[in-house]
Structures are given as structure tokens and as C-alpha cells.
């Protein structure tokens, strides 16, 4: 253990699970809040992804989210805005133990992802101070060679067509399907069982299994996560901190009887304060 009582990290639990064929479930953080990150980390997720693509999160906030995630026992990850060397380098230096990289359409795109995340001679990531290095039970550079979770997003019709070549790129741990952008790319009017959209996602899963990589996607409910695990998907995101908070708030708000005529108080106010 280090000076503040956090166990040293020997491997990455996310890459360990994905490479062994097991499911790994987490959620997206889009509220740009270390407090939310800390709260979510205690739920039991394997990982939490700070969404830097579709939220206004800044680097100062991101690094504090990573700290909160780590203290809560989950693996800190991020979705970067683009396959950009500087963005990816800074996010890894800030403490991410894996990245989800959007809009990967070709094998060449995937090779660039790996290069951006690897040090020489396997990549172009520049050496600099990385705050997570203090928590690694090994040389950080050596640790990154096998343990960074390198997840590419397949979210266009072109990417589905090129999925085998993309996932065959050395260093890529798995893929994450963006169902909404995929539907837009396919001009899909319907989604769900029996649709072309569903068939495309299952084709990506089939290809991933063929080349020995993990496939994943964003899910709207725990029931869908269970269904996707049964299908063979591994890297699965359940909603987001904002989505889960909103859902819980709506459910409780809808349960309020504003007429004052309901006698539903028995047992409802009982429980522990602490």
C-alpha cells in the first residue's frame, strides 16, 4: 500500500476480465462532478468512464473524478472527444487506466489509437509525469504495455463493415458500439430485435468473438445488460450518472400524491437515518 492507504495496482481488472471472456460493467459520468463520481464508485461498478466527448468536463475536474473513482474502488476511464494525440496523452497522464475512443471507422484509425496510447517504440505517446504512476506496483511504462484498456468505438455503417480489420489491430482490447450514432449512420428508423440495426450490432459481436476481442455497447436498463451478457457482449455501460439520477428522481416524484388523500404512510417513513 502507498502512504494514503490505497492498494498498489498490479494489473487492470478491466483488461483482465475482457481478455478472459468475462463481462465488465460500468457506467458513464456526464455530470462533471467528483462528488457524483465518488458516489457512483461505491455502487460496485468495475469501471466508470468520464465522458469528455459529450459533456463540458475540464481537465481539472476530470482528474478529481479519477481520484474519486479510484478511492471508491472502480477503474477510472474516459471517453475522449476524438482520436487526438494530445487529448489522449493528457487524459492518460491525468490518471485514466483506459480510454474509449469515438468514431473509429478503419483499421488505420485503430492503429492510430494504439499509437497514441503507447510509448515508443510501439507508439508516439510522450513521456511525462503521470499521476497514476504512483499507484502502480511496477514500472508505469511497462505496466501500460499490457494493462491499458484500449476500447475503440464502432458507431457507423462503415465501421461495422470494417469491424474485423479494426478489431484485429494489435493492442486493441475491444470495441464499444454506439447504438445511437450507428442508427443515424444506417438511417435506421427502427431498432430492437429483428431490425437491421440489431443485426449490425450482432455482426460486430460475431466478428469480435472470431478475432478474440471483447465487444460492448451502451444499455438503457439492467435488463438489457443481462440480455447482452447472455448474447456474449462483455464491455457494457448502463446508462449514466445523469440518466440514473433522473430516472430515480422521476420515479419518486411520480409516486407523490399531491391530493393528500392517500394513506400510504405506513412503513414508508421507516428506516435508518444513518
Where do the protein language model's features map onto the residues?
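Expand to "…catalyze enediolate/carbanion chemistry for C-C bond making/breaking, isomerization
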Residues: 1-274
Amino acid at each position: 500500500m502507498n502512504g494514503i492507504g490505497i492498494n498498489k495496482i498490479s494489473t487492470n481488472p478491466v483488461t483482465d476480465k475482457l481478455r478472459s471472456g468475462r463481462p465488465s460493467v460500468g457506467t458513464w459520468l456526464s455530470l462533471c462532478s467528483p462528488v457524483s463520481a465518488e458516489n457512483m464508485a461505491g455502487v460496485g461498478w468495475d469501471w466508470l468512464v468520464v465522458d469528455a466527448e459529450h459533456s463540458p468536463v475540464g481537465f481539472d475536474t476530470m482528474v478529481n473524478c479519477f481520484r474519486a473513482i479510484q478511492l471508491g474502488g472502480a477503474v477510472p476511464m474516459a471517453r475522449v472527444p476524438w482520436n487526438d494525440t494530445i487529448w489522449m496523452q493528457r487524459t492518460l497522464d491525468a490518471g485514466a487506466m483506459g480510454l474509449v475512443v469515438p468514431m473509429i471507422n478503419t483499421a488505420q484509425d485503430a492503429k492510430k489509437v494504439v499509437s497514441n496510447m503507447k510509448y515508443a517504440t510501439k507508439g508516439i505517446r510522450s513521456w511525462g509525469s503521470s499521476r497514476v504512476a504512483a499507484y502502480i506496483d511496477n514500472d508505469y511504462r511497462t505496466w501500460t504495455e499490457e494493462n491499458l484498456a484500449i476500447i475503440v468505438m464502432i458507431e457507423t455503417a462503415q465501421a461495422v463493415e470494417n469491424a474485423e480489420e479494426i478489431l484485429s489491430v494489435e493492442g486493441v482490447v475491444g470495441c464499444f458500439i454506439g447504438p445511437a450514432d450507428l442508427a443515424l449512420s444506417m438511417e435506421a428508423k427502427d431498432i430492437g430485435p429483428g431490425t437491421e440495426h440489431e443485426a449490425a450490432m450482432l455482426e460486430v459481436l460475431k466478428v469480435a468473438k472470431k478475432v478474440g476481442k471483447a465487444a460492448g455497447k451502451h444499455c438503457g436498463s439492467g435488463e438489457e445488460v443481462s440480455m447482452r451478457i447472455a448474447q456474449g457482449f462483455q464491455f457494457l455501460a448502463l446508462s449514466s450518472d445523469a440518466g440514473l439520477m433522473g430516472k430515480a428522481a422521476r420515479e419518486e416524484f411520480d409516486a407523490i400524491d399531491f391530493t393528500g388523500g392517500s394513506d400510504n404512510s405506513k412503513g414508508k417513513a421507516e428506516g435508518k437515518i444513518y
